[in-house]
Amino acid sequence: MQRSPLEKASVVSKLFFSWTRPILRKGYRQRLELSDIYQIPSADSADNLSEKLEREWDRELASKKNPKLINALRRCFFWRFMFYGILLYLGEVTKAVQPLLLGRIIASYDPDNKEERSIAIYLGIGLCLLFIVRTLLLHPAIFGLHHIGMQMRIAMFSLIYKKTLKLSSRVLDKISIGQLVSLLSNNLNKFDEGLALAHFVWIVPLQVALLMGLIWELLQASAFCGLGFLIVLALFQAGLGRMMMKYRDQRAGKINERLVITSEMIENIQSVKAYCWEEAMEKMIENLRQTELKLTRKAAYVRYFNSSAFFFSGFFVVFLSVLPYALIKGIVLRKIFTTISFCIVLRMAVTRQFPWAVQTWYDSLGAINKIQDFLQKQEYKTLEYNLTTTEVVMENVTAFWEEGFGELFEKAKQNNSNRKTSNDDDSLFFSNFSLLGTPVLKDINFKIERGQLLAVAGSTGAGKTSLLMMIMGELEPSEGKIKHSGRISFCSQFSWIMPGTIKENIIFGVSYDEYRYRSVIKACQLEEDISKFAEKDNIVLGEGGITLSGGQRARISLARAVYKDADLYLLDSPFGYLDVLTEKEIFESCVCKLMANKTRILVTSKMEHLKKADKILILHEGSSYFYGTFSELQNLRPDFSSKLMGYDSFDQFSAERRNSILTETLRRFSLEGDAPVSWTETKKQSFKQTGEFGEKRKNSILNPINSVRKFSIVQKTPLQMNGIEEDSDEPLERRLSLVPDSEQGEVILPRISVISTGPTLQARRRQSVLNLMTHSVNQGHSIHRKTAASTRKVSLAPQANLTELDIYSRRLSQETGLEISEEINEEDLKECFFDDMESIPAVTTWNTYLRYITVHKSLIFVLIWCLVIFLAEVAASLVVLWFLGNTPPQDKGNSTYSRNNSYAVIITRTSSYYVFYIYVGVADTLLAMGFFRGLPLVHTLITVSKILHHKMLHSVLQAPMSTLNTLKAGGILNRFSKDIAILDDLLPLTIFDFIQLLLIVIGAIAVVAVLQPYIFVATVPVIVAFIMLRAYFLQTSQQLKQLESEGRSPIFTHLVTSLKGLWTLRAFGRQPYFETLFHKALNLHTANWFLYLSTLRWFQMRIEMIFVIFFIAVTFISILTTGEGEGTVGIILTLAMNIMSTLQWAVNSSIDVDSLMRSVSRVFKFIDMPTEEGKPTRSTKPYKNGQLSKVMIIENSHVKKDDIWPSGGQMTVKDLTAKYTEGGNPILENISFSISPGQRVGLLGRTGSGKSTLLSAFLRLLNTEGEIQIDGVSWDSITLQQWRKAFGVIPQKVFIFSGTFRKNLDPYEQWSDQEIWEVADEVGLRSVIEQFPGKLDFVLVDGGCVLSHGHKQLMCLARSVLSKAKILLLDEPSAHLDPVTYQIIRRTLKQAFADCTVILCEHRIEAMLECQQFLVIEENKVRQYDSIQKLLNERSLFRQAISPSDRVKLFPHRNSSKCKSQPQIAALKEETEEEVQDTRL
């Protein structure tokens, strides 16, 4: 970053913001980068501001029982706030003085006041000086208030983040990430823009009093007629506002429903394509969109009338103010034009400034109260540790997670009852789940000495993770004692990867020890994986390690835990995603050898691990089922295997235990998710809700249990979207995932394989947040690239095609040599995304406008209609203006003129009625024309939005995965949320306002030019200067706004990342470290935002200076060239003053339109994406009636055809090569093999070897070369839909969308209820579905959060059974699966798919033994394709993974299955029960 010119700027330069000229000049000539941004002043740094506010808040907490955050803010910012408020007031007062001088100028042209003609020139000079003074007062005041608002936001940002890291887990249970992001974005952003309006709450009453006094002097009592109309108008607008809020609240629920389905579609786009559900999802979303648009139109019409009321109120304010006076005393031009000027100021104050100020205070105080509530929440309590303790002791410990699951079922009950489900089933369902809290752990006792290994086992929901949480202090015991040293290291069950390099993730801010680091890398089997990356361990990992396989993420998380030197290591199921061989090697080399002298607690269900543990603790229903050694376990608990394996399944648990399990499940995922989606409750909820957050959580568009990665989209309403947000989505060559799978691990669909030797990111470092956060934002450093990997620095050289994931990488400090790649990944909120800066121009192109206009043919005619009506309005206006400006000489005899009267009456009493009728007629005409003009425009623009949404949705669903892999899932969702919201809400009204303002200005200039042609000469250079200045500023401002948005993303991403890894972060004691990272992210954003505010104020001042020059020219031309006639001078000067304010408004509106049209550009970019191949590429042999059916014919009870394809399921693969993107490195090379009909093939290979990629290639989800044939039909001879329907798919990443059970099983509604029930019974789902009210019509929300992971897998299995597919693809179906569900899946595979070809990717040896052939994948290629006997006889991975004793028994197991030798199986079961139960139990 460069040193800011502000530091050495003079007072004049600061006053006129001239110090911003270098950045404006540079932005006009070239593309700006973050390195071009100036450093922030030290007073604006997050460290200083947060320390200042935190000190005052602590003082408030210590001194009062009811602390108020507003008091702390007042002590920090009050005096500067009031100083700028007084400047703002003085600037507003000048507006009231200007009409007085205008009246004197008009009066000087009275033929009877010729002696005053000589002072007209001085009055003109005074009038111009007032404009100059107003400019010099208002702009510094507005900028100062924006600056204070920015400082308040920064200070509260920091305070909230620090508090978040301290919150207790029980409080975090009731707070979703969506609520926190809303607190930081929607609420705190009000201070940035709103603080400048806050002072009008007291300025407007004073201004109104002053103006009414001046108007009273002119018109006496009739002045209150105009004020009364304004008050009525303000009340009318308030009523419209309430109506609009009602429509907005109704619409918010519909938007939420649409975004729920859309987000689920995006995060599971691979599954949608694999299931061929594109049309079903499109229809589902479009139906929701139709309902939403009905409410959108109603809200838009109300907003339109509200906006129109302001524009047309000017006629009636003047009319009602002057009418009573004119009827009594006649019309005096001086008074008319002075009153018009007063009314312009009065109208703005009463109808705009005061309501905005009241709304600002309402919003700001509400936000402060929410933040105050949040800051007083219960904090995390660190347990008292004894640092001299060498043992871990737990005595009679009992603990509860607070009840909270009941509210989920209450909502489910309410939501489904609203759908008129049967009430008879409610008791059946809810009686199964007690709503009372039950202990998650009861009376736990154990003691382990230093260096011992304690293995904790148990069935699903037994309390294993809760035990670790209690040791870490996250779960506070209600009874008993816990004793240990406090030096803990922790490895989570679901891997938490911090955006950054592999090295940074493992070191995690701890001092670097080369020998220890290399030892850990080797023990965790990461050497081979790291060696395949071009940058080795310095490769930048993306969102949650999205570029890695699930096994690689798990090993990095384990390596982080092992690298830390601690006394106690807590390992929560660290081997869940590892293949058998890798798991075995890591357990031996890492857990048993490298950590041999450390105390370890390992959560596992592997029998081999239990054998080698010093102590074993088996939990059952939260209680200690057994504690002792393995030999004691065999002797004392002969039934331990059923308890350990969980044969007492979830459905057999007692009601109390079920409630405890489900509560714990929600608790474990609540940090990563929002509350369940309420389909009926749409209103936003405050953080202060009857003392607890959990009562009415904010609607989420994402499910909390579906995964550990969880974000909430904070949907801004039209009233809240005050700013124009610029976003940027940088392409990343990786798997598309909005919510990386936490439970499911590696998905069947695309993922970057570690075998790829090419760069997984197209560019690892771009100058931007990544580099600038390497150093303090307050200090300038020259940064150069250093090639040594261990001390690598970051280059400032611009590199294209890097995502914000990489932008936010950096070290904590130069001195420590530590590097932390900070987070930039997200989505969940509109502020968190941004588009590829290279792909969208800094300024919206004319082509975008032209294309937008031609989207709907009616729009062109509507615009022509607007132009015609505008010409009619101008003609109508000229009638009154001409009449006033060209009044014939009055008749002395009939005139009411008196020489004693100080005011000239030009029009007779009789003719005044004639003027009155003309004025009323013209006003009514203008009002009617204005409404007729605007309504069709707004209606048509919303129709255009509807068309664009439909086209974009269709385009995304039909886009190939090679294209989607280069896009951020969050960016795609942002197009459907923020950009569509802009097209629906902001763009129509903004375009209407701009057109309205532009026509007003053009009309006023035309009238002035007609009345005084010389003025037109002054108008031409003003228009040219305006166009040039706007173009000059826009080129820079849009880039600054984009960089500001890019700088904002790390703030929210850092918050989300910190919350996801909060347990890990606390266990490692890295809170201060992450606070430093957060402050530097804030400082980076502040640098961008401060510069944007400064350049914006520079532009506003220049625009106003141009207007002042224009007004000076108009004033003196009018004074010097006008002869006799008050009317002409009055019209010209009044219109000139009106032009000044309106044109400045129009300029800002034009900039807003240009900014909003960037959303249209982004939508067009998505619409233009390529589509998947949908037609056969060459002719094939016809199957029926001489033609190949467009719809795949699948054998089922409904479709009985003579020719059915596929009939056998034979697959032939020839020279298959797969890539994620065109031109990318091959993930699989020259794969060739064949599978016989009905054969079962197992895929073997290390994690990341490409097994899942091969399954994706079968479905044509990747860029592939070569050929695959099914029953002799080549894949390039039929459509994609036909090809994919030949497969049944059971992916790791379970796809349950928000909808009924029936919709989830049969989205195309092809099957009858009876057939669905038969399949549900076959896969073991019937008992699950029947316990829900409504049964098949029960609406699942939040990714089916009320279902266990096993039940979700059964849903996928049921889909495959219904499809009657002949080829079944299974990718890790047993990952994190309870044994009961696993056994159901095995049984179903044997029965329902007995005649099908099955391709299985699995880590369980037991499941793989049922395969006839095995395909071994190594280094992108097929190494072996043989039977199990040959693999065991040769030196293979499979052989290495199985012990010799196992091998001896496996052959009999295989042979017995062939010759049906039951005695051998029985003997095997009796002799070695534990070997048969070989893997996860």
Curated annotation (Swiss-Prot):
UniProt binding sites for ATP 2: Y1220, G1245, R1246, T1247, G1248, S1249, G1250, K1251, S1252
Motif (PDZ-binding): 1479-1481
Ranges for region Disordered: 1462-1481
Subcellular locations according to the entry: Apical cell membrane; Early endosome membrane; Cell membrane; Recycling endosome membrane
Catalytic activity: ATP + H2O + closed Cl(-) channel = ADP + phosphate + open Cl(-) channel; chloride(in) = chloride(out); hydrogencarbonate(in) = hydrogencarbonate(out); ATP + H2O = ADP + phosphate + H(+)
EC number(s) on file: 5.6.1.6
Residues in compartment: Extracellular: 99-122, 217-222, 320-339, 880-918, 1012-1013, 1117-1130
Record PTM Phosphothreonine, positions in chain: T717
Biased segments, Acidic residues type: 1471-1481
Source superkingdom: Eukaryota
Stretches of the chain forming a coiled coil according to its record: none
Side of membrane Cytoplasmic, spans: 1-77, 147-195, 244-298, 359-858, 940-990, 1035-1095, 1152-1481
SUPFAM superfamilies: ABC transporter transmembrane region, P-loop containing nucleoside triphosphate hydrolases
Sites of the Glycyl lysine isopeptide (Lys-Gly) (interchain with G-Cter in ubiquitin) crosslink: K688
Chain residues that bind ATP 1: W401, S434, G458, S459, T460, G461, A462, G463, K464, T465, Q493
MF-aspect GO terms: ABC-type transporter activity; ATP binding; ATP hydrolysis activity; bicarbonate transmembrane transporter activity; chloride channel activity; chloride channel inhibitor activity; chloride transmembrane transporter activity; intracellularly ATP-gated chloride channel activity
Broad class of where this protein is predominantly found: membrane
Subunit record text: Monomer; does not require oligomerization for channel activity. May form oligomers in the membrane. Interacts with SLC26A3, SLC26A6 and NHERF1. Interacts with SHANK2. Interacts with MYO6. Interacts (via C-terminus) with GOPC (via PDZ domain); this promotes CFTR internalization and thereby decreases channel activity. Interacts with SLC4A7 through NHERF1. Found in a complex with MYO5B and RAB11A. Interacts with ANO1. Interacts with SLC26A8. Interacts with AHCYL1; the interaction increases CFTR activity. Interacts with CSE1L.
Main function: Epithelial ion channel that plays an important role in the regulation of epithelial ion and water transport and fluid homeostasis. Mediates the transport of chloride ions across the cell membrane. Possesses an intrinsic ATPase activity and utilizes ATP to gate its channel; the passive flow of anions through the channel is gated by cycles of ATP binding and hydrolysis by the ATP-binding domains. The ion channel is also permeable to HCO(3)(-); selectivity depends on the extracellular chloride concentration.
Comment field on protein domains: Binds and hydrolyzes ATP via the two cytoplasmic ABC transporter nucleotide-binding domains. The two ATP-binding domains interact with each other, forming a head-to-tail dimer. Normal ATPase activity requires interaction between the two domains. The first ABC transporter nucleotide-binding domain has no ATPase activity by itself.
Name recorded for this polypeptide: Cystic fibrosis transmembrane conductance regulator
